[in-house]
Design a protein with these regions (language model features):
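Conserved "ABC signature" C-loop
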Residues: 1-33, 56, 130-133
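Conserved ABC ATPase signature
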Residues: 31-39, 43
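Catalytic Walker B motif of ABC-type/P-loop ATPase nucleotide-binding domains
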Residues: 60-64
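Helix N-cap at the start of a conserved alpha-helix in ABC-type nucleotide-binding domains
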Residues: 71-72
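Conserved catalytic loops of ABC-family nucleotide-binding domains
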Residues: 80-95
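Conserved H-loop
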Residues: 95-102
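C-terminal portion of ABC ATPase nucleotide-binding domains
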Residues: 102-140
Length: 140
């Protein structure tokens, strides 16, 4: 019930959500301590993502959702999220990988709380503005 959080979902839906975040080894009746102490930080993060996917509506807001994950798992989950076809995905993070950056329809670049650039990966690189500078300095 930890994944479900008391909202009604079928077992099949919950299992698909666990598969989405690579936690197939978990069982729906698995004991999880209230404070998550019997899980790794990455597992806690992935359960949070699975909860979100289980109750997904039309817009998915992802705020640093892969921060506690290793690079390979983060890339896999980012790709799965970006492959969601029916939802609008707003993705907020400071840690990006080239493989996923190129999949975004539109990237907004903020500086001191204001949007200073927007466009696709290719457009932003071609404009040679703040995004280009951050990317070339290794900050993205």
């Amino acid at each position: 019930n930890n994944l479900n959080m008391e909202l009604v979902q079928t077992d099949e839906t919950l299992l698909k959500c666990m598969e989405f975040v690579d936690l197939q080894e978990f069982k729906l009746d698995q004991n999880i301590c209230e404070d998550g102490s019997n899980l790794s930080g990455g597992q806690v993060q992935r359960i949070g993502i699975a909860r979100t996917i289980a109750h997904l509506k039309e817009v998915l807001l992802c705020d640093e959702i892969t921060a506690s994950l290793d690079a390979q798992t983060a890339i896999e989950i980012e790709n799965r999220i970006l492959d969601l076809k029916e939802e609008t995905v707003l993705y907020v993070t400071h840690k990006y990988f080239d493989e996923t950056l190129k999949k975004f329809d539109c990237i907004l670049v903020f500086k001191q709380g204001r949007i200073v650039e927007q466009g696709s990966f290719e457009e932003l690189m071609k404009n040679k503005g703040d995004f280009f500078s951050l990317k070339n300095k290794g900050h993205i």
